[in-house]
Amino acid sequence: MKKILIVAFIGLTLIACSDTKKQEKDLLDNILKVHDKVMMNDDALMKNKTQLDSLLKLPAKDTAEKVNMKALDMKLLASEEAMENWMHKFEPDVANKSHDDIMKYYGDQKKAIMSVDSQMNVAITESNKYLSNRKK
């Protein structure tokens, strides 16, 4: 009877451990999916930034429009810097940390990269709108 209990305990422990590792892996995979999405948007960001930088070098016809272009350029720059900062600070190596610490860290990182994604989407959408209206 004792042997059965010991085997059952070991089995449950192994199942619990593998479940926590799966939770950690799933959360990390989720973070990396958002990161990959943000990186795909980087081309659009750089394209818009280049166009705005070129327009800003032209002689000013309308000061308000120049201010608007500069604000859009700064939003693009800020979202690019936010992504770079997140990438430099992100540490996927969580060896020797408890499951709770790993889940908290990954949860915080998921919120951070989602914030970067949102910031970048706003900057790209607003600059796309401005640039497409300017071409008309």
Language-model features and meaning:
Residues 1-4:
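Positively charged n-region of N-terminal signal peptides that target proteins for export
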Residues 68-113:
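Long, amphipathic, charge-rich alpha-helical segments that form helical bundles/coiled-coils
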Residues 35-77, 126:
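Post-signal-peptide N-terminal segment of Sec-exported extracytoplasmic proteins
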Residues 18-34:
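Short, low-complexity, disordered segments immediately C-terminal to signal peptides
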Residues 34-42, 98, 102-136:
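C-terminal amphipathic alpha-helix
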